[in-house]
Amino acid sequence: MLLGDYFQNIQSTYKNFFFSGISFDSSQVKKNNIFFAIKGNKIDGNDFILSAISNGAKIVITEKKINGLKNGILFIHSNNIRKLLAEISFKINNKIPNNIIAVTGTNG
């Protein structure tokens, strides 16, 4: 898959950059995957970027102000990484799920 087919606002320099899949879990990253470094309430995915790269990630998407190619790894900045992950997942899978389940809660 090529970045230009899935990312609308990607620089033309990177449109032909190949990727094989996506992951937001560094331990599940495979060769040439995109790693989405998502910051959560307790765990920051940015802390696992090196692990994702050692597992084969060639592209890292992060909310940190990092952009461009560094040591063969393409870093892409996103202001809304969760939305981008959802959009790219939909484009790759090309289907709407039959069921959507949501869990909500309160603090008391």
PLM region descriptions:
Residues 1-87, 91:
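N-terminal leader/targeting and accessory segments in enzymes
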Residues 90-108:
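Walker A (P-loop) phosphate-binding motif
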